[in-house]
């Protein structure tokens, strides 16, 4: 099949293909053969603030799953690229998790798109750390995103350990749903992802939708794909008093607030939301758009969003905040009447599940894993278009129905309660064991998908 980016990869009919193994809860204990896992996150540190630079849902995923795995008795060593001379070579952010900052290229000035030039340097740094001991001490390698996957592939080949890979996003899918003005993913990434599908011992997909994309666009073997949905920190993201949250954040208690949380880039669709909200605000006084996040890559910026709001005449009703730590972010969700996720591509949609866990309904694009993260017409609404007028209509309808919003909020708490990082760790442990055995998982019931 040919797709934007210029590359053709054989595809198979996903309807006729066997369904990938779906992973659900397993006993909370680690295998005696699974002692230590090397986690590769080249382009962003899991302890970086989500919503800044290239940090987002993947960071949240690695941080939480590593923490839970460590509690289960699996030592986790994370390797990421150092981005400051102040970064310590190694440190322990939580007990049982060691984070190594590998020097690979200059600390500043390299965009994510330029990091393929540093794959050799990063691989050399990882190997020096690992081979410098008496014996290779890791049971397996788990790589995240295609750049890390290339490094993991070489380590697998060099040291003879299994490779588990999680893509998080796929170039072929992003190119099919490309945002207006966004840049297509390059051929080198498409080729690299195809190689990883072939060379990984296991592929972890967030949803059955993502598993289908792997088979459709990359001819992946469904029998080595494990479906493991991400989770949410239900202790951090939980319902709370809306009035108290607004008071703490300095938001007007009389206004209706629609929140956007994420990186300011075309992929996430904040420009679409602003265009829709401008019409909502003109028709209904007392509505505010709260945008929480920072610029990532090129194409959009907080300054550009505010300039557009000025041009549309709604700047007084738009508030921009930088990315927030989890405790503050939970308050943002509780303070909002509605959270909007107009992304062009999402492998899952952690913002959506976090908002629902706090009791706030979600209006989201019907794309990727968002139909799994959001229960349509129950805990939120899915929109099968990126036309601003469609988003305006859905948002206006929800804001005009406070009882419906409250019912959706209650349903969202129940829906989000089905997803936890403990369950995600269970699924990863099952995938790891399958990789160590060199065989496929027996089919299990998915959390959802």
From Swiss-Prot:
It comes from the Bacteria. It holds the Pfam family Glycos_transf_1. UDP-N-acetyl-alpha-D-glucosamine binds at residues 49-50, 57, 263, 268, 324, 346, 354. Gene3D superfamilies: Glycogen Phosphorylase B (3.40.50.2000). Keywords: Glycosyltransferase, Magnesium, Metal-binding, Transferase. The keyword Thylakoid does not apply. Its EC number is 2.4.1.250. GO terms for molecular function: acetylglucosaminyltransferase activity; D-inositol-3-phosphate glycosyltransferase activity; magnesium ion binding. 1D-myo-inositol 3-phosphate binds at residues 43, 54-59, 112, 145, 169, 189. GO terms for biological process: liposaccharide metabolic process; mycothiol biosynthetic process. Signal peptide: none annotated. Mg(2+) binds at residues 333-334, 336, 360. It catalyses: 1D-myo-inositol 3-phosphate + UDP-N-acetyl-alpha-D-glucosamine = 1D-myo-inositol 2-acetamido-2-deoxy-alpha-D-glucopyranoside 3-phosphate + UDP + H(+). It is an enzyme of class 2 (transferase). Homodimer. Belongs to the glycosyltransferase group 1 family. MshA subfamily. Catalyzes the transfer of a N-acetyl-glucosamine moiety to 1D-myo-inositol 3-phosphate to produce 1D-myo-inositol 2-acetamido-2-deoxy-glucopyranoside 3-phosphate in the mycothiol biosynthesis pathway. This is D-inositol 3-phosphate glycosyltransferase.
């Amino acid at each position: 099949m040919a797709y934007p980016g210029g590359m053709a990869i054989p595809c198979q009919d996903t309807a006729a293909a066997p369904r990938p193994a779906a992973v659900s809860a397993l006993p909370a204990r680690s295998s005696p053969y699974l002692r230590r896992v090397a986690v590769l996150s080249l382009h962003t540190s899991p302890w970086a603030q989500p919503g800044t630079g290239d940090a987002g849902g993947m960071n949240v995923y690695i941080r939480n799953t590593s923490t839970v795995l460590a509690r289960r008795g699996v030592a986790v060593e994370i390797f990421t690229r150092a981005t400051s001379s102040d970064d310590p070579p190694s440190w322990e952010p939580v007990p049982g998790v060691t984070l190594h900052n590998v020097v690979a290229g200059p600390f500043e000035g390299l965009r994510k798109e330029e990091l393929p030039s540093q794959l050799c340097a990063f691989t050399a740094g990882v190997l020096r750390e690992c081979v410098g001991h008496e014996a290779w001490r890791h049971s397996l390698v788990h790589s995240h995103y295609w750049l890390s996957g290339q490094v993991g592939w070489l380590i697998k080949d060099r040291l003879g350990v299994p490779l588990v890979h999680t893509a998080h996003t796929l170039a072929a899918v992003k190119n099919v749903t490309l945002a207006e003005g966004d840049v297509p993913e390059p051929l080198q990434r498409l080729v690299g992802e195809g190689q990883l599908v072939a060379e990984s011992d296991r592929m972890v997909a967030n949803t059955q939708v993502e598993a289908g994309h792997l088979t459709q666009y990359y001819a992946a073997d469904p029998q080595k794909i494990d479906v493991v949905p991400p989770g949410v920190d239900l202790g951090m993201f939980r319902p709370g008093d809306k009035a108290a949250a607004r008071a703490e954040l300095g938001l007007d208690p009389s206004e209706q607030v629609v929140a956007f949380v994420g990186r300011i880039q075309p992929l996430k669709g904040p420009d679409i939301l602003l265009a829709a909200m401008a019409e909502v605000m003109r028709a209904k006084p007392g509505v505010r758009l709260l945008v929480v996040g920072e610029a990532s890559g090129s194409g959009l910026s907080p300054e550009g969003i505010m300039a557009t709001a000025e041009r549309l005449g709604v700047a007084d009703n738009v508030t921009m905040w930088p990315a927030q730590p989890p405790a503050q972010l939970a308050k943002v969700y509780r303070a909002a009447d509605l959270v909007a996720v107009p992304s062009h591509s999402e492998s899952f949609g952690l913002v959506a599940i976090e908002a629902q866990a706090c009791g706030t309904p979600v209006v989201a694009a019907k794309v990727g894993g968002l139909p799994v993260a959001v229960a349509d017409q129950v805990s939120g609404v899915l929109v099968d278009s990126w036309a601003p007028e469609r988003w305006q209509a859905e948002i206006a309808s929800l804001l005009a129905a406070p009882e419906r919003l409250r019912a959706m909020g209650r349903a969202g708490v129940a829906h989000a309660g089905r997803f936890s990082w403990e369950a995600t760790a269970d699924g990863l442990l099952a995938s790891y064991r399958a990789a160590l055995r060199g065989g496929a998982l027996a089919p299990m019931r998915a959390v959802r998908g």
